[in-house]
UniProtKB/Swiss-Prot annotation:
UniProt organism field: Caulobacter vibrioides (strain NA1000 / CB15N) (Caulobacter crescentus)
Similarity field: Belongs to the glycosyltransferase 2 family. OpgH subfamily.
Involved pathway(s): Glycan metabolism; osmoregulated periplasmic glucan (OPG) biosynthesis
Top EC class, one word: transferase
Single GO cellular component term: plasma membrane
GO MF term list: hexosyltransferase activity
Protein name in UniProt: Glucans biosynthesis glucosyltransferase H
Membrane spanning stretches: 65-85, 104-124, 415-435, 472-492, 507-527, 559-579, 583-603
């Protein structure tokens, strides 16, 4: 092992720059095993997608079933809304509303039908098409897999604590010789890079697998470029690469079973796991953690059921066939101005589409346990990450028509675009509806106060309108909250599983509170996503900031700066509707979320309150009630920082000094 002590000895430490850190980085790395990764000519492809190995013979039937169910539910919701709006005729603005409602109901229907299918599958005895069985004996591997941990200005101690836990877990399976671990750093901050190298020095001394550290001088291509650089330098030495994020955690058993599945299915290009969220401490993080654990698997299982060999990639916690990736996933600079041109921002969905175009199958592993990640701790960090993903998905719009893509790959790209485009559609739909309602002749004649409405209630009631409105509300409720309720029913149907959620009462209470909070947060996200799309299309694309993974408080100043415009908008709308009670009543759930944007942001980021909820069993998950061994092992010191080192400004900082994130 290379001697690195001079970097950290107090007597020889000096103020350093990132270039100096890179030049002085003498960590041993393996001999390069180059693998060509040519840039793909995205617009030049002869014919359609190459044929891939299908593991399920009735996939076309499944997709027809899903399509018919989605259309039926979407039409039912749209027809109920039409019956409500069309009483007395349809104005031009109401026609706009009805037009915008169509894609909204179809998207909700797809979400509901996918979850319903997943629920039905999970209520039976499902078998993994890939043959991944957690009850089977541990397989013996015959290939080598590289575990890639890309980092960018992260908390080095936390990253290496997770790596140490994964390394130990792999060793327990007896397969340490089949896995090498690479920390591939794109860190731009010299002091963070020094911290990474200090942690690596200890990790390498203790590791069971071969472990390596590489820092790039230029972070060309961001994460996709980071992985591509590794592939081009060392890819031919490894049959597979298991791609992680800095907050990823996977058991050794899960990694071994993924590698075994790749060995048994040589036509598989990628297998994506479903990471469960762990370590949530704030109210916001714990709510996401609870919701994902409770009902995420019904949607995930349904998605796996109808996507088959044409699934998608989430960018992490997935295993990839290295040769297939190198052959098909060299990403070019996209032509044209931003936001559509330049570096590919959201690479994962495009990479899975290119893999499938090249004849490699892309799968989900819906029944594999042992895959984890963490979530943003507050709504501000969630919105920041969401904006970055939004830009990446908008960039996919012209890529949907790329020649040679499988139609399912195009559908995944469309779903990604719609996940953000639905927010402005909802916004414009609501705006058109409110303007239309405000201009109705009945409201022009008189503005009813609450007392006037109560006194004249009997005369104003139109039972046909109430019936139509009730049906529209019921169908919308089922489409929105049905998957969550199905997830709870699944837990209740499985003996002993409800204990992991704190018991029936606590699970029901958590479900109710989560549904309320999600209903309040939805209008806020509608505003933030709509604004993000407008700014991105206007050319304000933003940079690549490091993620804050441990923020446990948002003060009023920060919350107001980010969300104050939403609260003000809600207050203005509420004041405008005060003398039109029907509008105020109809929009109350949306207005509540807007008005409370600032306090909800502050409350959601509260760590102490989140831990109190945990102590009382609210939002409990099985991984919290009985933490898996790897989750327990990933908590704790993973490195011994030097007594002091120096930042760029020459001031010494110690191990307890907070590391500054680079913008």
């Amino acid at each position: 092992m290379s001697d690195r002590s001079s970097l950290f000895d107090v007597r020889s430490s000096t103020s350093v720059t990132l270039d100096q850190v890179v030049r002085r980085d003498t960590v041993e790395i393996p001999d390069e095993a180059a693998l060509a990764m040519p840039v793909q000519p995205l617009s030049f492809w002869q014919g359609g997608a190459r044929r891939a190995t299908a593991l399920t013979q009735d996939m076309n039937l499944r997709r027809w079933m899903l399509g018919l169910m989605t259309i039926a539910m979407g039409v039912a919701g749209w027809k109920a809304s039409f019956d409500t709006i069309a009483l007395g005729g349809v104005t031009r603005l109401e026609a706009v509303v009805l037009t915008l409602l169509a894609p909204l109901f179809l998207a909700l229907s797809l979400w509901f039908c996918t979850a319903l299918i997943g629920f039905v599958v999970l209520m039976g005895r499902p078998k993994d098409p890939l043959g991944i069985d957690s009850e089977a004996p541990m397989p013996k591997l015959h290939t080598r897999t590289a575990i890639l941990m890309p980092v960018y200005n992260e908390d080095a101690a936390a990253v290496f604590a997770r790596l140490r836990a994964m390394d130990a877990s792999i060793a327990e399976t007896g397969s340490a010789r089949n896995f090498d671990i690479f920390v591939i750093s794109d860190t731009r901050d010299a002091q963070v890079a020094l911290a990474e190298q200090a942690c690596f020095a200890r990790f390498r001394r203790e590791a069971n697998c071969n472990v390596y550290y590489r820092i790039r001088k230029e972070n060309t291509g961001r994460k996709a470029g980071n992985v591509a650089d590794w592939v081009s330098r060392w890819g031919s030495a490894y049959e597979h690469m298991l791609v992680l994020d800095a907050d990823s955690l996977m058991t050794g058993e899960a990694m071994v079973r993924l590698a075994d599945a790749m060995e048994r299915h040589p036509g598989a290009g990628l297998i994506q796991t479903m990471p469960m969220i762990i370590n949530g401490q704030t109210i916001f993080a714990r709510t996401l953690q609870f919701a994902t654990r409770l009902y995420g698997r019904v949607a995930w299982t349904g998605l796996a059921w109808w996507s088959g060999s044409e699934s998608s990639f989430w960018g992490h916690n997935a295993i990839v066939r290295t040769r297939a990736f190198a052959e098909t996933c060299g990403l070019p600079h996209l032509p044209g101005p931003k936001p559509f041109g330049g570096e590919v921002m959201s690479h994962d969905a495009l990479e899975s589409a290119l893999l499938r175009r090249g004849g490699w199958s892309v799968h989900l592993a819906p029944y594999l346990d042992g895959s984890y990640e963490e979530s943003p701790s507050n709504l501000l960090d969630f919105a920041t990450r969401d904006r970055r993903w939004c830009r990446g998905n908008i960039q996919h719009v012209p890529l949907i028509a790329l020649p040679g893509l499988h139609w399912m790959s195009r559908m995944h790209l469309v779903i990604g675009v719609l996940s953000y485009a639905l927010s402005p559609l909802w916004f414009f739909c609501l705006s058109a509806g409110l303007i239309s309602r405000a201009l109705m002749p009945e409201l022009k004649k008189a503005a009813f106060t609450m007392a006037d409405l109560k006194a004249a209630a009997h005369a104003l009631i139109d039972w046909s309108e109430i019936q139509a409105t009730a049906w529209a509300m019921i169908i919308t409720f089922v489409l929105l909250f049905g998957p969550k309720i199905l997830g709870a029913i699944l837990v209740l149907a499985r003996k002993g599983e409800v204990k992991g959620f704190g018991g029936k009462r606590r699970m029901a209470a958590g479900l109710g509170v989560e549904m309320l909070l999600s209903a309040l947060v939805a209008p806020m996200l509608m505003f933030t996503q709509t604004r993000a799309i407008v700014e991105i299309l206007a050319g304000k694309v933003g940079g690549w900031a490091a993620q804050r993974r441990d923020a446990d408080k948002v003060d009023f100043k920060e919350a107001w700066a980010a969300m104050g415009w939403i609260s003000l908008s809600g207050l203005i709308l509420a004041a405008s509707f005060w003398f039109t009670p029907d509008l105020l009543t109809a929009t109350a759930p949306i207005l509540a979320g807007l008005v409370l944007a600032v306090p909800l942001t502050m409350l959601g980021a509260h760590k102490v309150a989140g831990l109190k909820l945990k102590a009382n069993g609210l939002f409990m998950t099985p991984e919290e009630r009985r933490p898996p061994a790897i989750v327990r092992a990933a908590v704790g010191a993973a490195c011994e920082p030097p007594i002091r080192w120096f930042a760029r400004n020459g001031r010494p900082i110690g191990p307890t000094t907070k590391i500054r994130d680079a913008a």
